[in-house]
Amino acid sequence: MNSQTALQYVKESGVVAGMRGAFPPDVALQVSAVMMGEGINCFEFMMNSEAPIEAMQAVKAEYGDDACVGMGTVLDVATAERVLDAGADFIVSPAFQPDVVKAVLARDVLMGPGVATPSEAVHAWNMGVRLLKLFPIGALGIDYFKAMF
Protein backbone atom coordinates (compact mmCIF):
# COMPACT_ATOMS: atom_id res chain seq x y z
CA MET A 1 0.00 0.00 0.00
CA ASN A 2 1.49 3.37 -0.93
CA SER A 3 1.45 6.49 1.22
CA GLN A 4 -1.54 8.10 -0.53
CA THR A 5 -3.68 4.98 -0.13
CA ALA A 6 -2.72 4.65 3.55
CA LEU A 7 -3.53 8.32 4.16
CA GLN A 8 -6.93 7.83 2.54
CA TYR A 9 -7.62 4.87 4.88
CA VAL A 10 -6.74 7.00 7.91
CA LYS A 11 -8.93 9.88 6.73
CA GLU A 12 -11.91 7.66 5.92
CA SER A 13 -11.66 5.56 9.08
CA GLY A 14 -11.34 8.56 11.37
CA VAL A 15 -9.93 6.21 13.99
CA VAL A 16 -6.63 4.38 14.22
CA ALA A 17 -6.89 1.61 16.80
CA GLY A 18 -3.69 1.52 18.82
CA MET A 19 -2.53 -1.86 20.10
CA ARG A 20 0.09 -1.50 22.80
CA GLY A 21 1.75 -4.48 24.40
CA ALA A 22 3.29 -7.78 23.45
CA PHE A 23 0.23 -9.11 21.62
CA PRO A 24 0.75 -12.62 20.26
CA PRO A 25 -0.55 -12.88 16.68
CA ASP A 26 -3.66 -14.85 17.68
CA VAL A 27 -4.74 -12.14 20.14
CA ALA A 28 -4.05 -9.41 17.58
CA LEU A 29 -6.25 -11.28 15.10
CA GLN A 30 -9.07 -11.56 17.65
CA VAL A 31 -8.91 -7.86 18.53
CA SER A 32 -8.68 -6.78 14.89
CA ALA A 33 -11.66 -8.99 13.98
CA VAL A 34 -13.80 -7.17 16.54
CA MET A 35 -12.59 -3.80 15.27
CA MET A 36 -13.16 -4.73 11.63
CA GLY A 37 -16.68 -5.81 12.56
CA GLU A 38 -17.26 -2.31 13.95
CA GLY A 39 -15.91 -0.62 10.83
CA ILE A 40 -12.46 0.25 12.16
CA ASN A 41 -9.88 -0.85 9.61
CA CYS A 42 -6.74 1.07 10.65
CA PHE A 43 -4.45 -0.51 13.22
CA GLU A 44 -1.27 0.81 14.83
CA PHE A 45 0.90 -1.60 16.77
CA MET A 46 3.51 -0.12 19.14
CA MET A 47 7.13 -1.13 18.67
CA ASN A 48 7.95 -1.96 22.27
CA SER A 49 9.29 -5.49 21.64
CA GLU A 50 9.60 -7.95 18.75
CA ALA A 51 6.05 -9.26 19.27
CA PRO A 52 4.34 -6.30 17.55
CA ILE A 53 6.07 -7.10 14.25
CA GLU A 54 4.64 -10.62 14.24
CA ALA A 55 1.21 -9.34 15.29
CA MET A 56 1.26 -6.67 12.57
CA GLN A 57 2.22 -9.24 9.94
CA ALA A 58 -0.57 -11.59 11.05
CA VAL A 59 -3.22 -8.86 10.77
CA LYS A 60 -1.84 -7.71 7.42
CA ALA A 61 -1.88 -11.30 6.12
CA GLU A 62 -5.46 -11.79 7.32
CA TYR A 63 -6.95 -8.60 5.87
CA GLY A 64 -4.58 -7.56 3.07
CA ASP A 65 -5.64 -4.24 1.60
CA ASP A 66 -8.97 -4.32 3.47
CA ALA A 67 -7.05 -2.90 6.44
CA CYS A 68 -4.30 -0.35 6.92
CA VAL A 69 -1.78 -1.76 9.37
CA GLY A 70 1.20 0.14 10.71
CA MET A 71 3.68 0.52 13.52
CA GLY A 72 4.09 3.24 16.11
CA THR A 73 6.86 4.09 18.55
CA VAL A 74 9.46 3.77 15.79
CA LEU A 75 12.51 5.62 17.10
CA ASP A 76 15.31 5.09 14.58
CA VAL A 77 16.09 4.28 10.95
CA ALA A 78 17.12 0.67 11.63
CA THR A 79 13.78 -0.06 13.31
CA ALA A 80 11.90 1.77 10.56
CA GLU A 81 13.59 -0.39 7.93
CA ARG A 82 12.78 -3.60 9.84
CA VAL A 83 9.15 -2.56 10.17
CA LEU A 84 8.93 -1.53 6.50
CA ASP A 85 10.48 -4.84 5.43
CA ALA A 86 7.80 -6.57 7.54
CA GLY A 87 5.08 -4.86 5.49
CA ALA A 88 3.92 -1.82 7.48
CA ASP A 89 1.49 0.46 5.64
CA PHE A 90 2.49 3.42 7.81
CA ILE A 91 4.91 4.38 10.56
CA VAL A 92 4.35 6.72 13.50
CA SER A 93 6.99 8.09 15.84
CA PRO A 94 6.68 10.13 19.02
CA ALA A 95 9.42 12.44 17.74
CA PHE A 96 10.28 14.33 14.57
CA GLN A 97 13.51 12.78 13.34
CA PRO A 98 14.43 13.87 9.80
CA ASP A 99 16.53 10.75 9.11
CA VAL A 100 13.60 8.46 9.96
CA VAL A 101 11.21 10.62 7.92
CA LYS A 102 13.52 10.48 4.89
CA ALA A 103 13.96 6.70 5.13
CA VAL A 104 10.21 6.07 5.33
CA LEU A 105 9.16 8.56 2.65
CA ALA A 106 11.84 7.19 0.30
CA ARG A 107 9.83 3.95 0.26
CA ASP A 108 6.53 5.78 -0.41
CA VAL A 109 5.11 4.79 2.98
CA LEU A 110 2.95 7.08 5.10
CA MET A 111 4.96 8.65 7.94
CA GLY A 112 3.50 10.33 11.03
CA PRO A 113 6.24 11.95 13.07
CA GLY A 114 5.54 13.43 16.46
CA VAL A 115 5.62 17.21 16.53
CA ALA A 116 5.25 19.59 19.45
CA THR A 117 5.97 22.96 17.86
CA PRO A 118 4.84 24.83 14.76
CA SER A 119 8.45 24.76 13.51
CA GLU A 120 8.56 20.96 13.69
CA ALA A 121 5.19 20.71 11.95
CA VAL A 122 6.25 23.01 9.10
CA HIS A 123 9.62 21.30 8.73
CA ALA A 124 7.93 17.88 8.53
CA TRP A 125 5.32 19.16 6.07
CA ASN A 126 8.04 20.66 3.86
CA MET A 127 9.76 17.26 3.81
CA GLY A 128 6.60 15.69 2.38
CA VAL A 129 4.94 14.42 5.56
CA ARG A 130 1.13 14.45 5.31
CA LEU A 131 0.29 12.93 8.70
CA LEU A 132 1.39 14.66 11.89
CA LYS A 133 1.16 13.33 15.43
CA LEU A 134 0.82 16.13 17.97
CA PHE A 135 2.75 14.67 20.87
CA PRO A 136 2.36 14.75 23.80
CA ILE A 137 -1.20 16.00 23.31
CA GLY A 138 -2.22 14.95 26.82
CA ALA A 139 0.37 17.26 28.33
CA LEU A 140 -0.12 20.05 25.80
CA GLY A 141 -3.92 20.05 25.84
CA ILE A 142 -6.62 20.71 23.27
CA ASP A 143 -6.16 24.49 23.45
CA TYR A 144 -2.56 24.07 22.30
CA PHE A 145 -3.76 21.92 19.40
CA LYS A 146 -6.35 24.53 18.39
CA ALA A 147 -3.79 27.33 18.54
CA MET A 148 -1.28 25.35 16.50
CA PHE A 149 -3.65 24.41 13.69
Named regions from a protein language model:
Residues 98-99, 106, 126-149:
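Active-site/ligand-binding-proximal alpha/beta "capping" segment
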Residues 41, 89, 130:
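Short acidic/polar active-site loop segments enriched in Thr and Asp
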Residues 55, 78-79, 99-100, 119-121, ...:
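Short acidic active-site motifs
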Residues 51, 91-92:
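Canonical helix-turn-helix DNA-binding module
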Residues 19-24, 71-77, 93-97, 113-118, ...:
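Glycine-rich beta-to-alpha transition loops that act as phosphate-gripper elements at the mouths
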Residues 1, 116-130:
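Alpha/beta catalytic cores of nucleotide-metabolism and tRNA/nucleoside-modifying enzymes
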Residues 1-86, 106:
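Conserved N-terminal beta1-alpha1 strand-loop-helix module at the mouth
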